Amino acid sequence: MKFLSLLLLAGIAQAIVPPREPRPPTGGGNKLLTYKECVPRATISPRSTSLAWINSDEDGQYISQSDDGALILQNIVTNTNKTLVAADKVPKGYYDYWFKPDLSAVLWATNYTKQYRHSYFANYFILDIEKGSLTPLAQDQAGDIQYAQWSPVDNSIAYVRGNDLYIWNNGTTKRTTENGGPDIFNGVPDWVYEEEIFGDRFALWFSPDGEYLAYLRFNETGVPTYTIPYYKNKQKIAPAYPRELEIRYPKVSAKNPTVQFHLLNIASSQESTIPVTAFPENDLVIGEVAWLSSGHDSVAYRAFNRVQDREKIVSIKVESKESKVIRERDGTDGWIDNLLSMSYIGDVNGKEYYVDISDASGWAHIYLYPVDGGKEIALTKGEWEVVAILKVDTKKKLIYFTSTKYHSTTRHVYSVSYDTNVMTPLVNDKEAAYYTASFSAKGGYYILSYQGPNVPYQELYSTKDSKKPLKTITSNDALLEKLKEYKLPKVSFFEIKLPSGETLNVKQRLPPNFNPHKKYPVLFTPYGGPGAQEVSQAWNSLDFKSYITSDPELEYVTWTVDNRGTGYKGRKFRSAVAKRLGFLEAQDQVFAAKELLKNRWADKDHIGIWGWSYGGFLTAKTLETDSGVFTFGISTAPVSDFRLYDSMYTERYMKTVELNADGYSETAVHKVDGFKNLKGHYLIQHGTGDDNVHFQNAAVLSNTLMNGGVTADKLTTQWFTDSDHGIRYDMDSTYQYKQLAKMVYDQKQRRPERPPMHQWSKRVLAALFGERAEE
């Protein structure tokens, strides 16, 4: 392995010539973006193609759907195609489908009912393509199956119903668990694991040879319940008593669900419970499961302690059921992100390895780790970060990935050889651009997606030749022509330097008819959460922010600033906010606003800030500083006190209340002077059916402000009946954005020398100072 380590110093291969000239969305016409074109979603936007690649004898094959609904097997290189499922065999109103690996059958999901962000209930049917027969996965199903997945090699399907695990094989079904119920989840995550750990709806994993199934069991017994009332409940006439949804929702320092690791032998139905001893049961989070073999020899899980600042990778030998910690890490200088990036690659110079991403060096990079434990091998290094692994090609010994090597706001696609350690760009990595790629099943081809800042496009390449595209997949020529009719906002990117030395990325939008000799109102639009990124070179969506920049009656300048704590600028920059969320972030937004005001065109009397979710929290914390810089603010679906938010997200960054009581008290929005002293107004928007950031946050915040003396001319609270975190129920999003537009219009019209005054206030002043107050 010395060979690999020495070659780490090998040079990076020469960058290729870009395949086409850039096509900046400069407009050039006279039309201005309108409200209806931008809100609630951008109607003028780039198109993109996403392919369902198929692993078959021919590389480059994928499934598409014809205009009449038939499913077609196509080869993207040869343009040959074959109808696999005729239109009359496609179930009406289906939600999704998955082909059996040998393409002999299709699993359909129908009768979709949404549950949480990723999960849903459905009926499932199996279509035998040769026979044309459609068979229900469960004869008595009633739209109640939670998840189903084909085995990678045979006729088996694992599915979850009623929180119990079942195995279907050629028409025969075996129930493998009997304890599923309201508090026990087999093979699917509960709410908090779905939302904060896996970001998906399953917790089961077939071995590569299909002989074993690893799955997790979650026990919510004792986890506190949160009740969400639904006042209309999607009915024309509201029920006399609201429907109440009870969710086991662990808040900070409350009891978390416990988790167990299980192995199931598919053929024998023998189940084994694997003791998880990496951390005590009440101090354990399992973040990832991955098979570390080409068959079923070993499987591993990533374990964290409760506050997710210590990590252990535990390998399990399937035959002996023996567990071994093969890697561990202390991340108590901040937190450890769950990147879900482990992938087995097999033999390298006589030793088995898997690949993973770690920021232990201070920057997120790719490493090879021995399956049985031992010294890791760094494949990438430097003061930049690997964002995602796109593909592992074990035959060519190449790992394809995206990174921020050029700049933290950019993404370029590279390959790195774990045989020679040579890193090669697949794109021109000397330009400010944002790329990603989708690789065919065998890795012979890829669709390169250029996503900004110019007009996006997609091209097909062979991995044998990254210099010349085989064809254009999506040109977006029509979008380019459409944009030529418009005079668009002027978008630019730059950095500002903090007194402490760090730099903050800024995205600025100027009105299309910007005149540096005029005064312009400004709206800051942060998100600002840990590890997030808003300022990037990706396509500038022509959304609400572009609308308020373009409307002649508004003409706002917008600034989006990625504060400390946000992503892709290294671990130190991220971890600075640990244990005190909202403190440095608010300081950075205030600093940026003061830098903005060095521009003569910035109207100091009309500087606003609007954010959603964490951005709504950050808006409130920024106004709380009472800096005098911001004159109005809008918080949409904000957290107001992280003691009211879920444990697995919050404790990752704040630890528990017992460990950080003062930090939680300071993080809560509790100081009212900044709101009382606003020259303008503060608006809170929240959905009453929000199962993520509960409406409780807005209720507590508005009560804090009202009881603290914030007057009615400074504060408005708007709720949206039964809407979730996205505020999409009924016509809520339409009303919401109209309210936002009215808010920024009213704030622009506000005159500091003569603020709007209600007749009651006029009468009070008249009584105190005489009739002159009425003038």
From Swiss-Prot:
Record localization: Secreted
Entry keywords, A to Z: Aminopeptidase, Glycoprotein, Hydrolase, Protease, Secreted, Serine protease, Signal, Virulence
Secreted in keyword set: yes
Annotated Gene3D superfamilies: alpha/beta hydrolase, Dipeptidylpeptidase IV, N-terminal domain
One example GO MF annotation: serine-type endopeptidase activity
InterPro entries with a match to the protein in the record: AB_hydrolase_fold (IPR029058), Pept_S9_AS (IPR002471), Peptidase_S9_cat (IPR001375), Peptidase_S9B_N (IPR002469), Serine_Prot_S9B/DPPIV (IPR050278)
Protease in keyword set: yes
Signal peptide: 1-15
Single GO cellular component term: plasma membrane
Enzyme class: hydrolase
Catalytic activity: Release of an N-terminal dipeptide, Xaa-Yaa-|-Zaa-, from a polypeptide, preferentially when Yaa is Pro, provided Zaa is neither Pro nor hydroxyproline
GO biological process, one term: proteolysis
Pfam families associated with the record: DPPIV_N, Peptidase_S9
Glycosylation site positions: 81, 111, 170, 219
Active site: 613 (charge relay system), 690 (charge relay system), 725 (charge relay system)
Enzyme Commission code: 3.4.14.5
Primary location recorded for the protein, binned into one broad class: secreted
Protein purpose: Extracellular dipeptidyl-peptidase which removes N-terminal dipeptides sequentially from polypeptides having unsubstituted N-termini provided that the penultimate residue is proline. Contributes to pathogenicity.
Family: Belongs to the peptidase S9B family.
Protein name, per record: Dipeptidyl peptidase 4
